[in-house]
Protein backbone atom coordinates (compact mmCIF):
# COMPACT_ATOMS: atom_id res chain seq x y z
CA UNK A 1 0.00 0.00 0.00
CA UNK A 2 1.44 3.34 -1.09
CA UNK A 3 1.93 6.55 0.88
CA UNK A 4 1.01 9.96 -0.53
CA UNK A 5 3.64 12.57 0.41
CA UNK A 6 2.41 16.16 0.08
CA UNK A 7 4.36 19.03 -1.44
CA UNK A 8 5.23 21.80 1.06
CA UNK A 9 2.40 24.14 0.07
CA UNK A 10 2.02 25.20 3.73
CA UNK A 11 3.94 24.60 6.97
CA UNK A 12 1.45 21.88 8.00
CA UNK A 13 1.69 20.13 4.63
CA UNK A 14 5.50 20.20 4.52
CA UNK A 15 6.01 17.13 6.69
CA UNK A 16 2.64 15.40 6.17
CA UNK A 17 1.87 12.12 4.46
CA UNK A 18 -1.21 9.88 4.28
CA UNK A 19 -1.94 6.32 3.23
CA UNK A 20 -3.36 5.84 -0.25
CA UNK A 21 -6.62 4.29 0.95
CA UNK A 22 -8.00 3.92 -2.59
CA UNK A 23 -5.59 1.04 -3.16
CA UNK A 24 -7.16 -1.18 -0.48
CA UNK A 25 -10.43 0.24 0.93
CA UNK A 26 -13.39 -1.12 -1.06
CA UNK A 27 -16.32 0.21 1.00
CA UNK A 28 -16.68 3.62 2.66
CA UNK A 29 -19.75 3.11 4.88
CA UNK A 30 -19.72 0.52 7.70
CA UNK A 31 -22.22 -2.35 8.01
CA UNK A 32 -25.14 -0.85 9.99
CA UNK A 33 -25.83 -3.98 12.02
CA UNK A 34 -22.21 -4.07 13.24
CA UNK A 35 -21.78 -0.52 14.57
CA UNK A 36 -22.94 1.48 17.58
CA UNK A 37 -22.26 4.95 18.96
CA UNK A 38 -20.76 5.73 22.34
CA UNK A 39 -20.49 8.88 24.43
CA UNK A 40 -17.05 10.52 24.44
CA UNK A 41 -15.40 10.33 27.84
CA UNK A 42 -12.35 12.52 27.13
CA UNK A 43 -10.19 10.41 29.44
CA UNK A 44 -12.62 10.68 32.40
CA UNK A 45 -13.93 7.85 34.59
CA UNK A 46 -17.48 7.49 35.96
CA UNK A 47 -16.68 10.09 38.64
CA UNK A 48 -15.67 12.66 36.04
CA UNK A 49 -12.01 12.57 37.03
CA UNK A 50 -9.26 12.45 34.41
CA UNK A 51 -7.69 8.97 34.48
CA UNK A 52 -6.00 9.22 31.06
CA UNK A 53 -4.36 12.52 30.24
CA UNK A 54 -4.23 14.19 26.81
CA UNK A 55 -7.61 12.91 25.60
CA UNK A 56 -10.56 14.95 24.32
CA UNK A 57 -12.27 16.35 21.24
CA UNK A 58 -11.68 14.65 17.92
CA UNK A 59 -13.91 13.59 15.07
CA UNK A 60 -17.10 11.71 15.84
CA UNK A 61 -16.63 7.92 15.52
CA UNK A 62 -18.81 4.85 15.31
CA UNK A 63 -17.63 1.77 17.21
CA UNK A 64 -17.28 -1.34 15.03
CA UNK A 65 -18.10 -4.73 16.59
CA UNK A 66 -15.10 -6.90 15.72
CA UNK A 67 -15.05 -10.69 16.04
CA UNK A 68 -11.85 -11.46 17.97
CA UNK A 69 -13.12 -14.88 19.12
CA UNK A 70 -13.44 -16.42 15.63
CA UNK A 71 -15.70 -19.10 17.11
CA UNK A 72 -18.01 -19.73 14.12
CA UNK A 73 -16.45 -23.08 13.24
CA UNK A 74 -16.76 -25.10 10.06
CA UNK A 75 -18.73 -22.48 8.08
CA UNK A 76 -16.84 -20.81 5.20
CA UNK A 77 -17.04 -17.04 4.92
CA UNK A 78 -16.45 -14.85 1.87
CA UNK A 79 -14.66 -11.51 2.17
CA UNK A 80 -17.17 -8.88 1.02
CA UNK A 81 -15.14 -5.73 1.68
CA UNK A 82 -12.02 -4.23 3.25
CA UNK A 83 -12.95 -1.22 5.40
CA UNK A 84 -11.31 1.61 7.34
CA UNK A 85 -11.81 1.68 11.12
CA UNK A 86 -11.12 4.98 12.93
CA UNK A 87 -10.74 3.16 16.27
CA UNK A 88 -7.63 1.10 15.39
CA UNK A 89 -4.57 1.13 13.16
CA UNK A 90 -5.50 -2.06 11.27
CA UNK A 91 -8.17 -2.34 8.57
CA UNK A 92 -11.25 -4.55 8.91
CA UNK A 93 -12.49 -7.29 6.59
CA UNK A 94 -16.26 -7.74 6.33
CA UNK A 95 -17.10 -11.46 6.15
CA UNK A 96 -20.34 -12.95 4.88
CA UNK A 97 -20.79 -16.53 6.14
CA UNK A 98 -22.56 -19.22 4.14
CA UNK A 99 -25.57 -18.96 6.50
CA UNK A 100 -25.89 -15.21 5.80
CA UNK A 101 -24.34 -13.83 9.02
CA UNK A 102 -21.88 -10.96 8.67
CA UNK A 103 -18.92 -10.26 10.96
CA UNK A 104 -15.88 -7.99 11.02
CA UNK A 105 -12.38 -9.40 11.53
CA UNK A 106 -8.94 -7.78 11.46
CA UNK A 107 -7.80 -7.70 7.82
CA UNK A 108 -4.53 -9.68 7.47
CA UNK A 109 -1.90 -8.72 4.90
CA UNK A 110 -2.78 -10.27 1.53
CA UNK A 111 -6.49 -10.89 2.20
CA UNK A 112 -8.60 -9.64 -0.73
CA UNK A 113 -12.28 -9.25 -1.59
CA UNK A 114 -13.62 -12.58 -2.83
CA UNK A 115 -11.28 -14.71 -0.72
CA UNK A 116 -12.76 -17.43 1.51
CA UNK A 117 -11.77 -17.87 5.16
CA UNK A 118 -12.80 -20.32 7.85
CA UNK A 119 -12.23 -20.99 11.54
CA UNK A 120 -12.04 -24.19 13.55
CA UNK A 121 -9.76 -27.24 13.87
CA UNK A 122 -10.48 -28.32 10.27
CA UNK A 123 -9.50 -24.99 8.67
CA UNK A 124 -6.55 -24.94 6.24
CA UNK A 125 -3.29 -23.20 7.12
CA UNK A 126 -3.84 -20.09 5.01
CA UNK A 127 -4.02 -16.35 5.62
CA UNK A 128 -7.16 -15.28 7.50
CA UNK A 129 -8.08 -18.71 8.89
CA UNK A 130 -8.31 -19.12 12.68
CA UNK A 131 -7.39 -22.34 14.50
CA UNK A 132 -6.38 -23.56 17.97
CA UNK A 133 -2.59 -23.39 18.33
CA UNK A 134 -2.32 -27.19 18.59
CA UNK A 135 -3.39 -27.47 14.92
CA UNK A 136 -0.98 -24.79 13.64
CA UNK A 137 2.49 -25.94 12.42
CA UNK A 138 5.58 -24.69 14.25
CA UNK A 139 7.15 -21.70 12.49
CA UNK A 140 3.84 -20.25 11.26
CA UNK A 141 3.32 -16.48 11.43
CA UNK A 142 0.19 -15.64 13.46
CA UNK A 143 -1.77 -12.74 14.96
CA UNK A 144 -4.89 -12.08 17.11
CA UNK A 145 -3.75 -14.59 19.75
CA UNK A 146 -5.84 -15.61 22.75
CA UNK A 147 -4.31 -15.72 26.24
CA UNK A 148 -7.18 -17.83 27.60
CA UNK A 149 -9.27 -20.25 25.50
CA UNK A 150 -12.56 -18.70 24.41
CA UNK A 151 -11.82 -15.19 25.68
CA UNK A 152 -10.96 -13.81 22.23
CA UNK A 153 -7.73 -12.50 20.76
CA UNK A 154 -5.75 -10.18 23.06
CA UNK A 155 -2.24 -10.16 21.58
CA UNK A 156 -0.80 -8.94 18.24
CA UNK A 157 -3.70 -6.91 16.85
CA UNK A 158 -2.23 -3.59 15.65
CA UNK A 159 -1.20 -2.69 12.09
CA UNK A 160 1.73 -4.72 10.76
CA UNK A 161 2.05 -6.82 13.93
CA UNK A 162 3.01 -10.48 13.67
CA UNK A 163 4.07 -13.24 16.07
CA UNK A 164 5.66 -16.63 15.40
CA UNK A 165 4.81 -20.04 16.80
CA UNK A 166 8.22 -21.30 17.98
CA UNK A 167 7.53 -24.68 19.65
CA UNK A 168 4.99 -26.94 21.35
CA UNK A 169 5.65 -28.54 24.73
CA UNK A 170 2.95 -30.53 26.51
CA UNK A 171 -0.18 -28.41 26.97
CA UNK A 172 1.56 -25.18 25.95
CA UNK A 173 2.83 -23.48 22.80
CA UNK A 174 5.84 -21.14 22.80
CA UNK A 175 5.23 -17.87 20.95
CA UNK A 176 7.61 -15.07 20.01
CA UNK A 177 5.76 -11.76 20.26
CA UNK A 178 6.56 -8.55 18.29
CA UNK A 179 8.20 -7.10 21.42
CA UNK A 180 10.73 -9.94 21.44
CA UNK A 181 9.08 -11.59 24.44
CA UNK A 182 8.94 -15.39 24.45
CA UNK A 183 5.98 -16.78 26.36
CA UNK A 184 3.92 -19.94 26.73
CA UNK A 185 0.22 -19.98 25.83
CA UNK A 186 -2.22 -22.88 26.11
CA UNK A 187 -2.46 -24.91 22.89
CA UNK A 188 -6.26 -24.63 23.17
CA UNK A 189 -6.00 -20.86 22.53
CA UNK A 190 -6.84 -19.69 19.03
CA UNK A 191 -4.79 -17.56 16.66
CA UNK A 192 -5.27 -16.28 13.12
CA UNK A 193 -2.82 -17.15 10.35
CA UNK A 194 -0.80 -14.32 8.79
CA UNK A 195 0.30 -10.78 9.60
CA UNK A 196 -2.02 -7.88 10.44
CA UNK A 197 -2.43 -5.62 7.39
CA UNK A 198 -1.62 -1.92 6.87
CA UNK A 199 2.16 -2.41 7.13
CA UNK A 200 2.85 1.19 6.04
CA UNK A 201 1.07 2.67 9.06
CA UNK A 202 4.39 3.24 10.86
CA UNK A 203 5.74 5.26 7.91
CA UNK A 204 2.96 7.88 7.95
CA UNK A 205 4.00 11.33 9.20
CA UNK A 206 1.25 13.26 10.98
CA UNK A 207 2.74 16.61 9.91
CA UNK A 208 0.79 19.00 12.14
CA UNK A 209 -0.75 19.27 15.59
CA UNK A 210 -4.27 19.71 14.20
CA UNK A 211 -4.25 16.22 12.75
CA UNK A 212 -3.60 14.81 16.22
CA UNK A 213 -6.55 16.88 17.50
CA UNK A 214 -8.79 15.25 14.86
CA UNK A 215 -7.77 11.92 16.43
CA UNK A 216 -8.87 13.11 19.88
CA UNK A 217 -5.34 13.56 21.23
CA UNK A 218 -4.63 16.79 23.15
CA UNK A 219 -1.24 18.47 23.76
CA UNK A 220 1.33 17.04 26.17
CA UNK A 221 2.97 19.72 28.34
CA UNK A 222 6.52 19.15 29.64
CA UNK A 223 6.79 18.84 33.40
CA UNK A 224 9.71 21.29 33.42
CA UNK A 225 7.40 23.96 31.97
CA UNK A 226 4.99 23.63 34.95
CA UNK A 227 4.98 25.00 38.49
CA UNK A 228 6.25 22.86 41.41
CA UNK A 229 2.66 22.33 42.60
CA UNK A 230 1.79 20.66 39.28
CA UNK A 231 4.81 18.43 38.59
CA UNK A 232 7.99 17.20 40.35
CA UNK A 233 10.05 18.69 37.47
CA UNK A 234 8.39 22.11 37.78
CA UNK A 235 9.72 25.41 39.12
CA UNK A 236 13.20 26.88 39.30
CA UNK A 237 14.72 29.86 37.54
CA UNK A 238 14.90 29.52 33.76
CA UNK A 239 15.65 26.08 32.34
CA UNK A 240 16.40 24.43 35.66
CA UNK A 241 17.45 20.76 35.98
CA UNK A 242 14.98 18.16 37.26
CA UNK A 243 16.27 18.38 40.83
CA UNK A 244 15.86 14.64 41.46
CA UNK A 245 18.11 11.59 40.94
CA UNK A 246 16.02 10.65 37.90
CA UNK A 247 12.92 11.67 35.95
CA UNK A 248 9.54 11.29 37.68
CA UNK A 249 5.90 11.04 36.60
CA UNK A 250 3.45 13.81 37.63
CA UNK A 251 2.64 11.59 40.65
CA UNK A 252 6.25 11.22 41.80
CA UNK A 253 6.90 7.69 40.51
CA UNK A 254 10.19 6.91 38.66
CA UNK A 255 9.81 6.80 34.88
CA UNK A 256 11.71 6.42 31.57
CA UNK A 257 13.01 2.84 31.79
CA UNK A 258 11.51 2.07 35.19
CA UNK A 259 9.90 -1.39 35.25
CA UNK A 260 6.19 -1.10 36.03
CA UNK A 261 5.20 -4.77 35.79
CA UNK A 262 3.85 -6.14 39.08
CA UNK A 263 6.37 -8.29 40.99
CA UNK A 264 5.63 -12.03 41.41
CA UNK A 265 2.72 -11.96 38.98
CA UNK A 266 1.16 -15.45 38.57
CA UNK A 267 1.75 -15.36 34.80
CA UNK A 268 5.52 -14.80 35.26
CA UNK A 269 6.05 -18.56 35.00
CA UNK A 270 4.81 -18.48 31.38
CA UNK A 271 7.33 -15.84 30.28
CA UNK A 272 10.58 -17.43 29.08
CA UNK A 273 12.24 -14.19 27.97
CA UNK A 274 11.13 -10.68 28.90
CA UNK A 275 10.40 -8.12 26.21
CA UNK A 276 13.23 -5.91 24.97
Curated annotation (Swiss-Prot):
GO terms for cellular component: large ribosomal subunit. Residues 223-276 are annotated as: Disordered. Keywords: Ribonucleoprotein, Ribosomal protein, RNA-binding, rRNA-binding. GO terms for molecular function: rRNA binding; structural constituent of ribosome; transferase activity. It holds the Pfam family Ribosomal_L2_C. SUPFAM superfamilies: Nucleic acid-binding proteins, Translation proteins SH3-like domain. PROSITE patterns: RIBOSOMAL_L2. The keyword Ribonucleoprotein applies. The keyword Cytoplasm does not apply. One of its GO terms (biological process) is cytoplasmic translation. InterPro entries: NA-bd_OB-fold (IPR012340), Rib_uL2_dom2 (IPR014722), Ribosomal_uL2 (IPR002171), Ribosomal_uL2_bac/org-type (IPR005880), Ribosomal_uL2_C (IPR022669), Ribosomal_uL2_CS (IPR022671), Ribosomal_uL2_dom3 (IPR014726), Ribosomal_uL2_RNA-bd_dom (IPR022666). Residues 265-276 have a biased composition (Basic and acidic residues). Belongs to the universal ribosomal protein uL2 family. Part of the 50S ribosomal subunit. Forms a bridge to the 30S subunit in the 70S ribosome. One of the primary rRNA binding proteins. Required for association of the 30S and 50S subunits to form the 70S ribosome, for tRNA binding and peptide bond formation. It has been suggested to have peptidyltransferase activity; this is somewhat controversial. Makes several contacts with the 16S rRNA in the 70S ribosome. This is Large ribosomal subunit protein uL2. The lineage of its organism: Bacteria, Bacillati, Bacillota, Bacillota incertae sedis, Caldicellulosiruptorales.
Amino acid sequence: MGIIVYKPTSPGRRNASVLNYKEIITKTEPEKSLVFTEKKWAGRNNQGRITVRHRGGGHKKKIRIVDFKRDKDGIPAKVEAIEYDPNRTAFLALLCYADGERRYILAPEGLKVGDTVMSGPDADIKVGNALPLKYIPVGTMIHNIELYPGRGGQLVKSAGAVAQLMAKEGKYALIRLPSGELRYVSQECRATIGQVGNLDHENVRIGKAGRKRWMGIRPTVRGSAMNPVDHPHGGGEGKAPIGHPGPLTPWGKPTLGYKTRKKNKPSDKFIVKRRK
